[in-house]
Design a protein with these regions (language model features):
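Non-transmembrane "mature" sequence context
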Residues: 1-141
């Protein structure tokens, strides 16, 4: 049986690991957004982070950044959109350019996926965009 001190140390270790994973996810998400040529405002809206947090993430200064569950979910969807695009396309221009291409499917109605997810910070738009891009890959997972 663990002592109270051992439980606290284990909990602290889990928190540190979770913070490190969250920071790594944020850093990856910001890099992807940069490759998608998202503006800072779009990136901040998509991830629902402040201007200063986004700027720190771009610099790799992640020590003081705290993320809530909504922000972590947004990072997860963005990383999964990127993973789906990497499965669909071998050409890096398509992997990173797809989100900036006008899409005439009913949900997008001529808008780019980046316009849809980068306007207003709507979580549902991020989810719906992920769902539609993910469906393109069929059973490739």
């Amino acid at each position: 049986m663990q002592t109270g001190c051992e439980v606290l140390m284990q909990t602290a270790s889990n928190v540190i690991q979770d913070k490190a994973a969250a920071a790594a996810g944020l850093k990856a998400a910001v890099r992807i957004l940069d490759k998608w040529r998202a503006t800072g405002e779009q990136g901040e809206s998509i991830l629902r982070v402040s201007h200063s947090s986004y700027a720190r993430a771009r610099r790799g200064d992640l020590a003081e950044i705290k993320l809530d569950s909504d922000q972590l979910a947004r990072i997860s969807y963005l990383l999964n959109i990127h993973a789906a695009l990497r499965m669909l396309f071998e050409n890096p221009d398509n992997v990173y350019g797809f989100v900036s291409m006008a899409n005439h499917n009913p949900y997008f109605n001529g808008r780019t996926p980046l316009e849809v997810i980068g306007t207003g910070g709507d979580f549902a738009a991020l989810y719906e965009t992920f769902k539609r891009i993910d469906s393109l890959r069929g059973a490739q997972w």
